[in-house]
Amino acid sequence: MADQLIRGTAADNGIRVVGVISTNLTEEARQRHKLSYVATAALGRTMASALLISSSMKKQEARLNLRIKGDGPLGGLLVDAGPDGTVRGYVQNPGVELPPNAKGKLDVGGAVGKGFLYAVKDFGRGYPYSSTVELVSGEIGDDVTHYLATSEQTPSALLVGVFVGAEGVTAAGGILLQILPKAARDESLVAKLESRLGQLSGFTPLLQQGKSLHDIFQDLLGDEDLNIFPETQMVRFDCGCTFERMMGALKMLGQDELLDMIEKDGGAEATCNFCNEVYHADVDHLSRLVEELKADAH
């Protein structure tokens, strides 16, 4: 099934619901960064969360950054996503592997440890909005839900998951339910949604059963005046880094540093943290930058 995101409302527009399938982009991240099983799960859950949250940002150029910094062996991770359906991210220590937790699952919480979640929303105009919350469990879903409830003051239920095995990622994605102010006063509705989500064994088992996002929406909200929007948005891993951007960054180092690279290293190499793409600049490239800087100085 193609990576995609759909949206809808329910309960007379009192509930916003967003769902995403991110299997292929999570597998791409796993391959690019050579991620362990537990690192794949941590990054995949965070990428799904970021896509779900950023989908409600109005401007296409808006971006959401989710950074998780814990004291566990994973170190930390950073994800960048936008309402255009693009996402990228990386893990500080991608090779970390841990034994399964007490439930026999990948121990994402143990890999992340205790720490904080930092969120920055850049709306494409004005100043970015940033907030920080303490991690609840390190399992990502709980932590992002806590962020939404405390920083955005929106009662939310988030279910994200990644299934990764010897053949790679075979299921990944999530669903976000947000209760808007007009429905938040209906305690029975809130309790019903919490109960239904609580009965689910996770998000990836639903995909493995062959359910589509439409099916999952119907199962959860079919009796609550569900309205699924007709647009299906494609989502993908996309970094946006280019050789030209790398050259621009090198140019900022100045003439002396560039001349030193030419003399000592015979060129330069840069690796993008977000996608692990490696860019090479040879002596000719660096020499042109030096000439440009000389021309700019006159």
UniProtKB/Swiss-Prot annotation:
Q: Which UniProt keywords apply?
A: Chaperone, Cytoplasm, Disulfide bond, Redox-active center, Stress response, Zinc
- Any one GO biological process: protein refolding
PTM note says:
Under oxidizing conditions two disulfide bonds are formed involving the reactive cysteines. Under reducing conditions zinc is bound to the reactive cysteines and the protein is inactive.
Please verify whether the record's keywords include Iron: no
Q: Name one GO cellular component term.
A: cytoplasm
What is a GO molecular function of this protein?
protein folding chaperone
Subcellular localization: Cytoplasm
Q: List the disulfide bonds.
A: 239-241, 272-275
**InterPro entries in the record:** Heat_shock_Hsp33, Heat_shock_Hsp33_C, Heat_shock_Hsp33_N
HAMAP family of this UniProt entry? HslO
Give a short account of what the protein does: Redox regulated molecular chaperone. Protects both thermally unfolding and oxidatively damaged proteins from irreversible aggregation. Plays an important role in the bacterial defense system toward oxidative stress.
Which family does the UniProt entry place this protein in? Belongs to the HSP33 family.
Name of this protein: 33 kDa chaperonin
What is the organism of origin for this protein?
Picosynechococcus sp. (strain ATCC 27264 / PCC 7002 / PR-6)
Q: List the lineage, top down.
A: Bacteria, Bacillati, Cyanobacteriota, Cyanophyceae, Oscillatoriophycideae
